[in-house]
């Protein structure tokens, strides 16, 4: 199948993060322009969509109505679809002297399927990072008062179940970034097209993918470590309570035994 949009001078890319996961197994290989990543023609004008299993669809040259129709078609294939998807747009201009990325626009010498796939990869990773940056910032806001409470009053107000839940949330974010989106990995398209390394590097710099992932990893580690520390403090507190309960029971047993012995003695 021919890539019709390659003849366009200007092209708009729109990336949408639609849900936690997108099931791609139902698409027929015969209907695809490419399978890694899955790329299909969406409308009669030749607009295409590049789909990623971690819930992102990237559209190139697709009219609004066709995009809406296609997104609706994808909804049954989504796990935990988002009510309001994350969106990123990028202008693509071809027929330029070279390849470059600046201020939300990509300049290309010509348009090819491989170049669009690389652009889609960078856009999709940018959206995943944007979503989890928001989630991690929210967790930071929630856990800071707990740490402040420990520093000020020497106690933990939240229970260990709640704290362990936060640790689980951080591990889940890390799993989705590394295991599904593979944020730190280069796109597979580069394996057969090493000449496009420069394009991907420019996009990586434009969206600061490496720096943002590194910052997010540090925040995830900090939140997880803080929650673990608070959970340990809580567990120790509960253990001390239990120890006092045991001591109390022992004292009570001794008191009962002495009472019974004293009764026998006075008889």
Model-derived regions: residue spans:
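Short secondary-structure boundary segments
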Residues: 10-35, 113-134, 200-201, 252-255, ...
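Short, flexible segments with low predicted structural confidence
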Residues: 103-104, 148-149, 194-195
């Amino acid at each position: 199948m021919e890539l019709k949009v390659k003849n366009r001078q200007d092209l708009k890319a729109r990336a949408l993060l639609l849900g936690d996961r997108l099931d791609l197994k139902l698409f027929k290989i015969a209907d695809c322009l490419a399978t890694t990543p899955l790329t299909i023609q969406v409308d009669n004008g030749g607009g295409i969509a590049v789909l990623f299993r971690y819930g992102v669809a990237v559209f190139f040259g697709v009219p609004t109505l066709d995009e809406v129709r296609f997104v609706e078609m994808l909804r049954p294939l989504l796990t935990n679809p988002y009510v309001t998807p994350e969106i990123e747009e990028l202008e693509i201009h071809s027929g330029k002297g070279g390849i470059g990325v600046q201020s939300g626009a990509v300049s290309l010498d010509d348009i090819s399927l491989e170049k669009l796939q690389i652009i889609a990869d960078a856009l999709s990773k940018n959206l995943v990072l944007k979503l989890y940056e928001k989630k991690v910032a929210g967790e930071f806001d929630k856990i800071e008062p707990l740490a402040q409470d420990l520093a000020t009053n020497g106690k933990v107000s939240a229970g260990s179940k709640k704290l362990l839940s936060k640790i689980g949330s951080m591990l889940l974010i890390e799993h989705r970034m590394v295991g599904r989106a593979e944020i730190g990995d280069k796109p597979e398209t580069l394996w057969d097209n090493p000449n496009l390394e420069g394009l991907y590097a420019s996009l990586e710099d434009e969206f600061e993918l490496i720096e943002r992932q590194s910052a997010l990893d540090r925040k995830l580690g900090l939140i997880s470590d803080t929650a673990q520390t608070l959970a340990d403090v809580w567990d120790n507190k509960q253990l001390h309570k239990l120890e006092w309960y045991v001591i109390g029971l022992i004292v009570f047993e001794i008191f009962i035994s002495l009472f019974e012995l004293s009764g026998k003695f006075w008889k």
